[in-house]
Each structure stands twice: as C-alpha cells, then as structure tokens.
C-alpha cells in the first residue's frame, strides 16, 4: 500500500510537466541553472488566462429588414422577398454571426441584382437603393460581430494553455481566415465584385477548436515570464561564475553545458516556433487590435510579442556577455 501511495504521489507531482511538455522545458532549464549556481530557483509569477471583454461591451445590434414594400411581384422574381422571409423565420433569427455574415453578402448581391437586372417602379427602386446603401454601411458592424462576439472567435482569442509544437498544421487555416476577414473589411463600399464568393461558415469549425491565437498570446506571456526570471537568476549570481586562466572553471563548464544541451537544443527552437507562428498570425493580431480599439477596448497580443522579443534578447545578451568575459566562442551562438 505504501509503495502504491508513493508511486501515486510521484505521478501526481509530475503531472504538470507530463501534461505540459512546453512549460517543462523552461522549468528544467531554470532548475538546472539554479542547481549549477547552487542557489534556489526564483519564484515565478503565474501567467493569467487570456480573456477578452464581455460580449455585451462589443456586440452591436442592427435593425432587421422588414418585408414592407418588398412584397411586389418583381421583388419576388429577383429573389429578395424569399431571402428576407427566410432570414425573418424562426431559424433565420437565431443565426450565429458567421451564418449571418454569409446572409449579408448574399443580401448585397441580391439587392444589386434586383437594382441592375429587373424593371422596378420608382418606389421600389428608391426603397431598394436606400436598403442597399444601408446594408453596405452596416457591413463593418456585422464583421465586428463575427470577429469580436461570435462564440467561435471568442474561443479562438482566449486560452490558458501553451502552444503545442503539434499545432503547426493549424496555423495556415487560422491565418487564411484572418486574411479573408481583413479583405472583407477593406472591401470598398459599393464594389460588389470585391465581396467573397465563398461561404465564411467553412472557416468556423477549425477556428473554434484550435484556440491558436489565444494560445500564442498565452505562450508569449509565459515564455517572457520564464525568460525574465531566468535572466535575473543568472544576473544576480554572475559573480559566482568563475572563469579565466588558472581558475577553477568547473561551474562555468557546467553552465555552458546547460546552455548548449537545453537552451540551444530545446528552448531556442521552441522560441523560434512561437515567434514564427505569431508572425503568420500578425495580420490577424493587427486587425483584432484595431477593431477592439474602436470599441474603447484592447486585446494586447502585439505588446505581448514585443515583450517576448525584448525578454529573449535580454537573455541572449547575458550569455553573449558571459561567453565574451570568459573568452569562449560557442559554435551555435545564441540569436534572438
């Protein structure tokens, strides 16, 4: 029974590293350096989960189109009546923002077709022209509701776990979705040919289950924190590090070994992966920040990436300074 108890205790104590191999790399790196320096590891500030403002602070309600004057024969012929009637049905009223965005592009195309291809009375043309202009004005609002308030995107933008190296195949899809949304925002008012011919719903499932942007953001914060405390650990104890001729360089050689075997072989490749993933999502990050700012809110991932770069560079500079002081040229010298 005692053996079973201690085995279970060991298993539980190792769960964090076992379930989170990315964090485990940084824990190992920090602990090994502390061991070599013969000092306790520094206390780490736990990183908060990535959240976004409440949906109510970001959602914008827009008026529904009523059938009103649209019940004429011509408007039935051009497809407008049936399209709006379907939207006003029980199912249409509960469409999520992705489906609603598809409806808005279909509506703009249908309105344009009615105005350009069907004989209309003066009243009908006046009404449809007003609706057409109104729907173009509303398009950025519908896009904001997709980007900032849909359940899909709120899941995509939030996270409390590290970016896994196994998520490489998700990046292209998420990046493509942000590019498509960005292109929609940049569509000139009234230029029907610039509206997408595809359905936005096709992007929904992958965006919802990946949480890629949120994980990148959480990982930028987490790696910045680990690099910061590790750099401080080294800086505060650099007087302990002895090197030079006729000196006992055992400790320095151990540190160099930790640098080579853990930083160069494990930490640095992961940092490069995180940075590369962020770069591929940069257009999406900029778009989110811009649209949040218009609502008086902020997301913060761009600043998190800047901090990540700063902390990485500070850590690299410590090692470069130490190796220079000790007259050592490292084959794979650290790079930011």
PLM segments and residue spans:
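Alpha-helical oligomerization segments
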Residues: 276-336
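C-terminal motif of bacterial Sec signal peptides marking the signal peptidase cleavage site
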Residues: 12-14
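N-terminal Sec/ER secretory leader and immediately downstream segment
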Residues: 19-168
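Sec-dependent signal peptide recognition
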Residues: 1-7
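Sequence contexts marking disulfide-bonded cysteines in secreted/extracellular proteins
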Residues: 16, 79, 115, 242-244, ...
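Extended amphipathic alpha-helical interaction segments
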Residues: 127, 132-284
């Amino acid at each position: 029974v005692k053996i079973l108890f201690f085995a279970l205790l060991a298993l539980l104590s190792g769960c964090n590293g076992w379930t989170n191999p990315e964090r485990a790399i940084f824990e190992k790196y920090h602990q090994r350096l502390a061991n070599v320096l013969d000092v306790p590891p520094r206390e780490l500030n736990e990183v908060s989960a990535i959240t976004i403002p409440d949906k109510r602070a970001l959602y914008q309600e827009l008026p529904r189109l009523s059938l009103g004057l649209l019940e004429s024969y011509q408007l039935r012929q051009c497809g407008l009546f049936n399209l709006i009637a379907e939207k006003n049905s029980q199912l249409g009223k509960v469409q999520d923002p992705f489906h609603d965005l598809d409806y808005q592009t279909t509506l703009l195309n249908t309105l344009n077709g009615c105005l350009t291809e069907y004989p209309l009375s003066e009243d009908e043309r006046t009404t449809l022209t007003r609706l057409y202009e109104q729907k173009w004005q509303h398009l950025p609002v519908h896009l904001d509701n997709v980007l900032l308030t849909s359940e899909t995107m709120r899941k995509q933008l939030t996270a409390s776990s590290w970016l896994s190296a196994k998520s490489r195949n998700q990046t292209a899809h998420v990046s493509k979705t942000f590019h498509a949304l960005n292109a929609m925002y940049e569509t000139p008012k009234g230029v029907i040919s610039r509206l997408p011919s595809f359905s936005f719903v096709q992007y929904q499932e992958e965006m919802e289950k990946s949480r890629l942007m949120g994980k990148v953001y959480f990982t930028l914060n987490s790696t910045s924190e680990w690099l910061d405390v590790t750099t401080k650990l080294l800086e505060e104890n650099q007087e302990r590090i002895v090197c030079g001729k006729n000196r006992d360089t055992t400790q320095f050689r151990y540190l160099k070994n930790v640098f080579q075997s853990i930083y160069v072989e494990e930490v640095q490749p992961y940092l490069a992966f995180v940075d590369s993933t962020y770069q591929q999502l940069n257009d999406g990050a900029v778009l989110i920040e811009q649209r949040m700012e218009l609502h008086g809110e902020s997301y913060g991932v761009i600043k998190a990436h800047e901090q990540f770069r700063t902390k990485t560079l500070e850590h690299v500079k410590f090692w470069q300074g130490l190796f220079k002081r000790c007259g050592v040229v490292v084959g794979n010298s650290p790079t930011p």
